Amino acid sequence: MGSEMCIRDSGKPEHLIEYGKQSAMALGVDSIDLLYLHRHDPEVPYNESCEGIKALLDQGVAQWAGVSNVSIEQLKIAQEILGDKLVAVQNQYSPIHLDTQDTLDYCAEQGLAFVCWSPLGGYRHPYDEHLFDPFREVAETRGVSYQRVVLAWELAKGDHMFVIPGAHRPETILDSLKADELELTEEELAKLS
């Protein structure tokens, strides 16, 4: 979707349907595997935006749906409208951003994937750096990067947890991939919580 399409009226069902079809065409696919409703348009009731996504599912433009940046209240609305086609929630979560813990827990209860964006905290203010000190301590003991420890801690939250860290260098990508192999002890997890 071009940015000019997303600036105005992006949450209206008719626009979401149009954008979804254009996205499938641009990707060269008949059907998008997982289509996210990324941001709530404050000018459009959330249930109406979800109805637009449902129409795309019903038309076969998408197979599965996800929602992003949602509260539990919005998630419940999406569940009601999208039913079992809703499979994923993508919210920010990191040692700095723990305010979506309730949504993370709710996803575990509901069998929904929780896709954690900005799992390393994204842009950080210097006054947030102390929040990573316990991760640095565990990393030093283990001989790995603290970023790998952060990702391993997040992945330890459950099988429903997925992380999507950003990276610019190949070695950073490879380090992030190894987080799945790092099994933290109960003592380490307690220290990080």
Regions flagged by a language model, labelled:
Residues 1, 18, 48-51:
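Alpha-helical macromolecular-interaction surfaces
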Residues 1-7:
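Short, small-residue-biased leader/transition segments that mark boundaries at the very start
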Residues 8-14, 38, 43:
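Active-site mouth loops of central-metabolism enzymes
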Residues 11-27, 73-76, 99:
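Short, acidic/polar
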Residues 22, 31, 52-56:
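Structural preference for long, well-ordered alpha-helical segments within the folded cores
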Residues 24-45:
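Active-site groove signature of glycoside hydrolases
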Residues 44-193:
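Beta/alpha (TIM)-barrel catalytic core signal, keyed to glycine-rich beta->alpha loops juxtaposed to Asp/Glu
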